[in-house]
Amino acid sequence: MQLNSTEISELIKKRIAQFDVVSEAQSTGTIVSVSDGIIRIHGLADVMQGEMIELPGNRYAIALNLERDSVGAVVMGPYADLAEGMSVKCTGRILEVPVGRGLLGRVVNTLGQPIDGKGEIDNDGFSPVEVIAPGVIDRQSVDQPVQTGYKAVDSMVPIGRGQRELIIGDRQTGKTALAIDAIIAQKDSGIKCIYVAIGQKASTIANVVRKLEEHGALANTIVVVASASESAALQYLAPYSGCAMGEYFRDRGEDALIVYDDLSKQAVAYRQISLLLRRPPGREAFPGDVFYLHSRLLERAARVSADYVESFTNGAVKGQTGSLTALPIIETQAGDVSAFVPTNVISITDGQIFLESSLFNSGIRPAVNPGISVSRVGSAAQTKAIKKLSGGIRTALAQYRELAAFAQFASDLDDATRKQLSHGQKVTELLKQKQFAPMPVSEQALVLFAAEFGYLDDVELERIGSFESALLAYANSNHTDFMKNLAKSGDYNDSIKDQLKAIVEDFKKNGAW
């Protein structure tokens, strides 16, 4: 069959009419060097600071240095097979992570991908890892407590919802143990928890996850992992990813608690990236913006007002405030809190819990130093019962420390001094607590009541621990309803005071410990 010229012309016109051309403008570039997870790219004239750059093999890098004729970017993931001359392109978007209730009970990496072998995550959407913190008008003052379950913390350095409380101390002083116990204590409080592990051994993280599961707290917790074997870029970004996951709950009128374990390792990872990008080093070789690294992260922990929540949810949630409480951890070297990163984080946070290796080694655990541990906003959030009963604890410990130092040089002491020393020793003994045994408000109130009103004066120092255990067992078995109500309300009045007095006096009359 032969086509004449008219038919050919019509066919060509028909094909031209059917042809749909979509022009796509792409900003592409070429890798000019690869070293230690840092790539330099020629081209990409339109790239933004912090933009994701698509690499071969379904990987991404983040643009951190925008220079005159090249772009410095950090690779998120393996980089050994990247080579000079490979083509890369802009994506036009910044790093986002999955957020939502589907992440609770899961272990994820910095990018929000599951690494616990439990299948895909049913997330509610995505959120950028870098978000501007709520402004002053959107915030509300801290006036609700976060119970850690530790007598020493809840009585002397109370933490409120929306507060940033630093946990600082040398290695092996119980920093992680304190944070994990605080998470375990939230399993029935309705507070969602996020634990961000930065630069730790995989075996240590696995142990933490197992402990959370054993104590029924994992179902309420998201674990974000950037282990020591991960690249510096992922260790640097992990806290921001965890924070974005916590903000999901904060912005919907719920309460969340996030632990950064620890920010010293994040600062080291950021220093490594900055030096490889040839940014000028400053004090201790950290870059000039290491303060901003932590301040922009910790300022995102806040208690936000009901108006903010209503506006964010487009009216779906009304009359509820939201909060994100942060417990950053910093590791010091030989107790030096005046080093660069520790002083930065101390100045950003609303107080610090200082753990001392000398106390830890002498068997005082948690090893909280009450002299330099402080909570700047938490006292407004403390439960009434603990606030009323813990007033004398800090004073007793401060006097005891002072007198103990003085008593070393004095041969004979008067009765009043001996009494103060004895009381201080007993209070110190009473504040000791085993790991994975957080105490509800009612039990703390009962124990503090016994200390405050002199019921320990005739108990031998060695018997304080057994006295406490027996007293709590007696109260929980014989006054169950009262203890449950006190744990729920945390209130304190004359009626509760009389009831506590009756419990302790009855126990001392009948109890064997």
Swiss-Prot record:
For whether the record's keyword set contains Translocase, the answer is yes
Catalysis: reaction(s): ATP + H2O + 4 H(+)(in) = ADP + phosphate + 5 H(+)(out)
Q: Cite the entry's keywords alphabetically.
A: ATP synthesis, ATP-binding, Cell inner membrane, Cell membrane, CF(1), Hydrogen ion transport, Ion transport, Membrane, Nucleotide-binding, Translocase, Transport
Q: What is its main location?
A: membrane
Record flagged with keyword Translocase: yes
- The signal peptide stretch is none
Report the locations given in the UniProt record. Cell inner membrane
Q: What is its EC number?
A: 7.1.2.2
Annotated ATP binding lies at G169, D170, R171, Q172, T173, G174, K175, T176
Question: Per the record, what is one GO cellular component?
Answer: plasma membrane
According to the UniProt entry, its GO molecular function terms are: ADP binding; ATP binding; proton-transporting ATP synthase activity, rotational mechanism
Which superkingdom is the protein from?
Answer: Bacteria
UniProt enzyme class: translocase
Any Pfam family matching the protein? ATP-synt_ab
Fetch the Gene3D superfamilies from UniProt. 2.40.30.20, ATP synthase alpha/beta chain, C-terminal domain, P-loop containing nucleotide triphosphate hydrolases
Function summary = Produces ATP from ADP in the presence of a proton gradient across the membrane. The alpha chain is a regulatory subunit.
Q: How does it assemble?
A: F-type ATPases have 2 components, CF(1) - the catalytic core - and CF(0) - the membrane proton channel. CF(1) has five subunits: alpha(3), beta(3), gamma(1), delta(1), epsilon(1). CF(0) has three main subunits: a(1), b(2) and c(9-12). The alpha and beta chains form an alternating ring which encloses part of the gamma chain. CF(1) is attached to CF(0) by a central stalk formed by the gamma and epsilon chains, while a peripheral stalk is formed by the delta and b chains.
The UniProt entry's sequence similarity note says: Belongs to the ATPase alpha/beta chains family.
Fetch the PANTHER family from UniProt: ATP SYNTHASE SUBUNIT ALPHA, MITOCHONDRIAL (PTHR48082:SF2)
Q: What is this protein called?
A: ATP synthase subunit alpha
Species source reads Actinobacillus pleuropneumoniae serotype 7 (strain AP76)
